[in-house]
Design a protein with these regions (language model features):
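Alpha/beta-hydrolase-fold catalytic nucleophile elbow
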Residues: 50, 108, 133-134, 180
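Cap/lid segment of the alpha/beta-hydrolase catalytic domain
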Residues: 11-96, 103, 138-148
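Alpha-helix C-terminal capping segments
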Residues: 98, 122-126, 171-173
Length: 205
């Protein structure tokens, strides 16, 4: 489920667009509206889609977070994979809209939505640019700092190969990516944010 936001009045010709992934909030109203309404006001189409276990999109992906399902990792299952499939379908829907220029679609989102915008850009080469807003961290932060105990499973694409997000970032290059983090973030270490950004920057050189 989701909402397609369009400029009013609608200009002639196809629009650049933003795919916005919602994070997981206690309410679907108000928490991210200031991040989504800005796009149609600036001439973009914006499709805001619900992540799994949010509003009208049922499911469960909090096995590590609160379900004690550590077997998910050994079985090669990652809840981020389910979220990614959901996000890729949202991208297909948006890119097929007659109002949208499919060559000019960026992705963004906050918290779990930030993680999903990152993974969507990794998997979908048609994404023109990505701006993950928090939600993306290094493997050390995830496991060493026990970040998985404080966040939804959708932020961690661990699986059997135990790949770091820095490895995934290499798959976005050379397309533009801007990481947006909080200096006072208590859930993910700002030091690990810097590690992620510095190593990703090295890939682009």
């Amino acid at each position: 489920t989701g909402n397609l936001l369009l400029p009013d009045p609608l200009p002639d010709g196809p629009l650049p667009a933003v795919l916005f992934a919602n994070g997981h909030n206690s309410s679907a109203v108000g928490d991210t509206s200031h991040l989504t309404l800005v796009w149609p006001r600036r001439g973009y189409a914006c499709f805001v889609f619900d992540t799994i276990q949010q509003t009208d999109n049922p499911g469960s992906h909090r096995g590590l977070h609160s379900g004690g399902r550590f077997d998910w990792i050994s079985r090669g299952y990652t809840a981020a994979g389910g979220e990614l499939l959901n996000g890729l379908r949202a991208f297909e829907l948006l890119s097929g809209r007659p109002e949208v220029d499919p060559r000019k679609i960026g992705v963004t989102g906050r918290s779990g939505g930030g993680a999903q915008s990152f993974f969507i850009a990794v998997a979908e080469e048609r994404v023109a640019a990505a701006v993950p807003i928090v939600g993306v961290a290094s493997l050390k932060c995830t496991i060493g700092d026990r970040g998985y105990r404080d966040q939804c499973d959708c932020m961690y694409a661990l699986g059997l190969y135990q790949r770091d997000n820095i490895d995934f970032a290499a798959l976005i290059a050379p397309r533009p990516v801007l990481f947006s983090f909080g200096a006072a973030d208590t859930l993910f270490s700002p030091d690990e944010y810097r590690t992620l950004v510095d190593k990703t920057r090295g890939i682009y050189r």
